[in-house]
Amino acid sequence: MKRPSGRAADQLRSIRITRNYTKHAEGSVLVEFGDTKVICTVSVENGVPRFLKGQGQGWLTAEYGMLPRATGERNQREASRGKQGGRTLEIQRLIGRSLRAALDMSKLGDVTLYVDCDVIQADGGTRTASITGAMVALADALKVIKKRGGLKGGDPLKQMIAAVSVGMYQGEPVLDLDYLEDSAAETDLNVVMTSAGGFIEVQGTAEGAPFQPEELNAMLALAQKGMTELFEMQRAALAD
């Protein structure tokens, strides 16, 4: 089996995490997984949604979108259609669920964190890149809240979160699929994990033939290997 990119089966794409990418947001990152590029920002606003009023905890929510020409052909803006598509809603809910697992909301205070992930170029794995990059932007936003005199109850960051795709490509498990691989893969799996080694989400779909238990185990092992590298990249980015 030869991957279109020439990478080894267990090799991530070239990954870059650029912090403080935009001027105004409390946390901002440009994350690049190969040719997939996503701007991730975290904005801090006082107050929480109505369903959390008086409960003494904060909240985090996420939105996701793609520029019209992030892909090979122009896509109509969802705003011009008047509604978000099902894929967009699914991905932004995944991002929100994943990042909430990083936080102790009771220590966040009366604050809402708005995570925005905007894909400026797509070449596969936009949701996993979004989660991995937004986690770094979230860590930076928490530092800003602390500098402003917040977080009196302690650090709400429990653990780091990252995500990566794995799949069965030409009968073999591979890590971090690009678009060419993703579009031809027999199985596509998105995995979200904590830096402590726990799984937050595993999304898997077979195309054509079902995948077998031993293939699932092989893909998860590959994802865990990739996560080790991603968490190290996040730590290195935050140490700069």
Swiss-Prot record:
Entry-linked InterPro entries: ExoRNase_PH_dom1, ExoRNase_PH_dom2, ExoRNase_PH_dom2_sf, PNPase/RNase_PH_dom_sf, Ribosomal_Su5_D2-typ_SF, RNase_PH, RNase_PH_bac-type, RNase_PH_CS
Enzyme Commission designation: 2.7.7.56
Main enzyme class: transferase
PROSITE patterns, per database record: RIBONUCLEASE_PH
SUPFAM superfamilies: Ribonuclease PH domain 2-like, Ribosomal protein S5 domain 2-like
Binding site for phosphate: 87, 125-127
Described purpose of this protein according to its UniProt entry: Phosphorolytic 3'-5' exoribonuclease that plays an important role in tRNA 3'-end maturation. Removes nucleotide residues following the 3'-CCA terminus of tRNAs; can also add nucleotides to the ends of RNA molecules by using nucleoside diphosphates as substrates, but this may not be physiologically important. Probably plays a role in initiation of 16S rRNA degradation (leading to ribosome degradation) during starvation.
Similarity-based family: Belongs to the RNase PH family.
This protein's name: Ribonuclease PH
Organism the protein comes from: Pseudomonas syringae pv. tomato (strain ATCC BAA-871 / DC3000)
